Amino acid sequence: SILIFDEAHLMPQDYLQPCLQAVAYITRYLHSEAVFLTATMPDFEKLIKEYALPDSKIVKLIKDTSMFAEFQKCRYRYIGGISSSELLSRCREYPSSLIIVNKKATARELYQECGGKRYHLSTYMTSYDRKRILKEIRQELKQLEADYPEYKDVPEDRRITIISTSLIEAGVDLDVYTVFRERTGLDSILQAGGRCNREGKRKTADVFIFDRTEETRQAVSDDKASLTKGLLKKYEDISDVRCIEEYYSRLYFMKVDDIQKNTMHQICSDLASIPFKEYAEKFEFIDSRQVSLVVPRDAQSEKLVETMKYTKTGNARKLQNYTCSVTRKELEDLIRQHAADDYGTGIYCLTNKDYYDEYKGVLFEAPDYFL
């Protein structure tokens, strides 16, 4: 068999060693091959030799990287601290802009502040609404390009601003004129760059990396963001292979204790001694602090929820399209306001439509009504 790992850099650091060891075992003892794909490749050769099977055979499929620069579609520029109003004003200078921020609350605040033609995307919105908005964005971008092929003299009322969380960075096919990315890990910033001049129709385009002046120092001092800041000062081009390699080398060095605490030790060569149950219980790709919340949006979803209420069983798969994500505290607030219930099934649903907006997502206070 051939196993393809897309976005391989997203393997969780806490369980990196068991992941790599599992891949190494599969390739050796089950006579398979593994292909790692990513635009931001860590030094997996070094990591596999250190944390998995040292004598594993590793081959780089692309040995000559000298032509990479020819395919570079954007340049990355760090602009430092900027206020929300300055950021939005600067975005409106371009035919189409994408702002990507680290927090859902920030995305919503910017959307509410933003004027003109604007779009908002976050997991506060259901998958149903995110797909609908993305379809509308693609249509608008396509029409904008048709009307202004050179993007010259685009009137203000036709300029597009998209405000999103990191959900737009992978698997979303959008091509905008300019991207503004709040400082975070280098891997995320380079993924954000993939939405800028995606089709390479212009010689170059800009991805601006910024810090929000409204954020506290603590909010932007996580390890990945701090590493990125140092690399932005050191490298003129942060998409350079050397920069990416240094980023991961330093990141994994900083996280060595996290990696080693869940190591599948070499003494576990006997399958019976591998703690499968412990790994299964602790291994998480999805943040456990987030909870799914079903928001009925049409007759089909309402019928599914009604069935769930009376049968006390829920079909999570069928409801997936109508599901958004909130924190446990946010869910508790909704329950306290009698706006959410699980009807004894463990699948929580929004019970009051006033607590949801199709463009903003879940609201945590119902709108005020005046008679």
Identify the role of each PLM range.
Residues I4-F5, V101, S164:
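Hydrophobic residues in beta-strands of the RecA-like P-loop NTPase core, especially within AAA+ ATPase
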Residues T27, S85-Y94, A105, E109-Q112, ...:
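C-terminal helicase lobe and adjacent C-terminal extensions/tails of nucleic-acid helicase motors
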Residues S1, Y25-H31, R92, K142-E156, ...:
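Conserved catalytic network of the ASCE P-loop NTPase/AAA+ motor domain
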Residues S1, L30-S32, A69-C74, G116-K117, ...:
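Short glycine-/polar-rich loops that comprise or flank the Walker A/P-loop
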Residues E150-E169, R181:
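Conserved two-lobed SF2 helicase motor
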Residues I160-V176, Q191-E199:
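SF2 helicase motor core recognition
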Residues Y25, T40-E93:
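Interdomain hinge/linker at the junction between the two RecA-like core domains of SF2 helicases
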Residues I2, E7-L47:
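Conserved helicase ATPase motor motifs in RecA-like P-loop NTPase domains
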